[in-house]
Amino acid sequence: MWIADGWKDYEVIDCSDGEKLERWDKYTLLRPDPQVLWSTPKKNPAWNKLNGHYHRSNKGGGEWEFFSLPKQWTINYRDLTFNLKPFSFKHTGLFPEQAANWDWFSELIKNSPKKDIKVLNLFAYTGGATCAAAKAGATVTHVDASKGMVTWAKENAASSGLADAPIRWIVDDCVKFVEREIRRGNKYDAIIMDPPSSVSYTHLRAHETA
């Protein structure tokens, strides 16, 4: 198991009763987490000093309740800076556990004997992996179907000092983009792929190419 233990601006403070108490820089958020199956005493004072609480609805979805929380703020991981904006389905725009993967492939890129590493990041969301790969020296193609997410990823790149980095921003269906890249004969040294749960395994397998 890899542990994302390089964070200074993020930590899981506590968890109980299906919820996770987190610190995102100087702000404390409480969000639902289905993996928190236990009920333990909530002794940490941070439980009573929330800046944001996402309430899950019995009908699905839910809504945020804010307490002195800005609409947007930044969080740092090593030499990367990300813009956070709480939005639907309890999200903040970043999955901090992915930092373990960022560290892993960043070292591979830096230590590669090949100078120009080309990375394809599919379902790339707000660009955490894109920024990490670009900061390590790779040329990155960032693909996501959401224009809003690609715009957000560009903001993260700019905040991380990567506004002029060799990143190609693509708003497109990832599977269709890959099909076109195969027909074009374009190749990459590495592919990063973290599809949302709404993309079925069968759908992805149907588009596999050796």
Region annotations inferred by a language model:
Residues D116-L122:
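Conserved class I S-adenosyl-L-methionine
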Residues T139-D144:
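Conserved SAM-binding motif I beta-strand of class I
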Residues W152-K187:
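S-adenosyl-L-methionine
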Residues E97-S112:
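Conserved alpha-helix/loop element of class I SAM-dependent methyltransferases that forms part
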Residues H203-A210:
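Single conserved hydrophobic/aromatic residue that forms the stacking wall/gate
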Residues K8-E22, L29-P96, D103:
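Non-catalytic substrate-recognition/targeting regions of SAM-dependent transferases
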Residues T126-G137:
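Conserved SAM-binding loop of SAM-dependent methyltransferases across substrates and taxa
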